[in-house]
UniProtKB/Swiss-Prot annotation:
Keyword Transcription: yes
Organism: Arabidopsis thaliana (Mouse-ear cress)
Keywords: DNA-binding, Nucleus, Transcription, Transcription regulation
DNA-binding region: 23-129
Source superkingdom: Eukaryota
Lineage of the species this protein comes from: Eukaryota, Viridiplantae, Streptophyta, Embryophyta, Tracheophyta
GO biological processes: flower development; leaf development; regulation of leaf morphogenesis
UniProt-listed Pfam families: B3
Localization (cell): Nucleus
Role played: Regulates lateral organ growth. Functionally redundant with NGA1, NGA3 and NGA4.
Alphabetized PANTHER family for the sequence: B3 DOMAIN-CONTAINING TRANSCRIPTION FACTOR ABI3, B3 DOMAIN-CONTAINING TRANSCRIPTION FACTOR NGA2
GO cellular component: nucleus
Name used for this protein in its record: B3 domain-containing transcription factor NGA2
Amino acid sequence: MNQEDKEKPIEEASSSMEREHMFDKVVTPSDVGKLNRLVIPKQHAERYFPLDNSTTNDSNKGLLLNFEDRSGNSWRFRYSYWNSSQSYVMTKGWSRFVKDKKLDAGDIVSFQRDSCNKDKLYIDWRRRPKIPDHHHQQFAGAMFPRFYTFPHPQMPTNYETHNLYHRFHQRDLGIGYYVRSMERSHPTAVIESVPVMMQRRAQVASMASRGEKRLRLFGVDMECGGGGGSVNSTEEESSSSGGSIPRGRVSMVGAGSLLQLRLVSSDDESLVAMEAASLEDHHFFTKKGKPSLSFDLDR
C-alpha cells in the first residue's frame, strides 16, 4: 500500500508534465452573464478547435468537447460558430461550469491538452490577480501630488547700493525655488551729498522770496521772474549748499535776459527747471548789445 501511494504522486506529476498548454481566456462580464456562452478568440479557435464547412454554416450543430478539470470531473461543452456575431463560442454546459466554479469577470480559464493524445482536453481556472491596496494610493499620489507650504525665508535687511540702483539678491532654497528680495520703498537719492528733495524745497523758497512765478508748459516747469541777480543767487545758493550743482547745466545768455536750463538726475524722477530772469546789470557780458552763448558742464 505504501508503495502504491508513493507511485500515485509520481504518475500525477508525470501526467501534468505531459500536458500541453493551449491558451488562456480572461472571462468578461458577458462570458459569465445571462448569455450562457464563452467566446473563444478566433486565432485559438481555428488552431485548436477547427470546424469543417458544414459545422460552420449551421450554428445549431457543432462539436461536443469533453474536458477534465483538476478534480477529475468531466465537463462537456457545445462548441460552434455563430454567423450573426462571427465568433466561436462554447454554449451548452458552460453556464453550469460558471456556477460550479463561481467564476467572476476577470477570472482566467486555461485550456490544455495531452501532449500524446490531442483529443484529451483539460480545463482549469484561477482567480483574477489581486491588486494591492497601496498600488492605488501610489497611483493617486502620482496623479495628484500633495502640495506643501514651504516656510518663507527671512531675507537680510541690509541692501547694497551702486549707482543709485539696488541689487537684487537671490537665495537658493534647495527645493527648486528662487526668492528675490524686492524693496519697494527707495531711499531719497543723494547727489553730491545733498538730497534732491531738500534742494528742490530750497529752490521753491528762493523763488518765493524773489517773487518769481512758476509755469508748467508741455511737461516742463518754467520759472519766470523780474528780479535781478538771479544767476548770482542761484550760484551762491548752490555753493553754500555744499557744491550741489547739478551734473549738467546749459546757460544761454542774451542781452536783456538769461535762459538757464538745469537738468537734475535722481533715482525716482528727472527734474527739469528752466529759469528766465531779466538782467539789469550787464557786467556778465563781455560785449554790450551782443548776445553770448555759454555752456557750463560739471562732471
